Amino acid sequence: MPVTDSIADFITRIRNAGRARNKTTDIPYSKLRENMSQLLLEKGYIKNFTVITTEKFPIIRVDLKYGATGESAIKEITRVSKPGRRVYDGKDIKKYLGGLGLYILSSSKGIITDKEARAQGVGGEVLFRIY
């Protein structure tokens, strides 16, 4: 069955795998999903990810990160801008949870965090928030 919102599918797969305490999860490949995975890796929310090319279609295998007591590094991950209600924010985007969490934006500079958007003076579509 085709997915109408690939970003929500990406978020849901990661959230569900974290709640089920899975070490890895497989996500259908797209360049956008690869860029979001790279950003989550850079910010320390996931352990690693690899792009696996199979005969039928490529996938992204995400290795989830857990603390010493077994809690997921991702406490909350929520879609903000949806197909029915797009959310855009300017270069003066506010901090999520006073800077403890991140907004992930799609801007003219690529997939960036709210902190990077403020530093570069750009805005964009707020894809999701993560804490």
UniProtKB/Swiss-Prot annotation:
Functional summary from the UniProt entry: One of the primary rRNA binding proteins, it binds directly to 16S rRNA central domain where it helps coordinate assembly of the platform of the 30S subunit.
Entry keyword set: Ribonucleoprotein, Ribosomal protein, RNA-binding, rRNA-binding
InterPro entries to which the protein is assigned, alphabetical: Ribosomal_uS8, Ribosomal_uS8_CS, Ribosomal_uS8_sf
A GO BP annotation: translation
GO function terms (MF aspect): rRNA binding; structural constituent of ribosome
Family: Belongs to the universal ribosomal protein uS8 family.
Domain of life the protein comes from: Bacteria
Subunit structure: Part of the 30S ribosomal subunit. Contacts proteins S5 and S12.
GO cellular component: ribonucleoprotein complex; ribosome
Protein name: Small ribosomal subunit protein uS8
PANTHER family hit by this protein: 40S RIBOSOMAL PROTEIN S15A (PTHR11758)
SUPFAM superfamilies the UniProt entry points to: Ribosomal protein S8
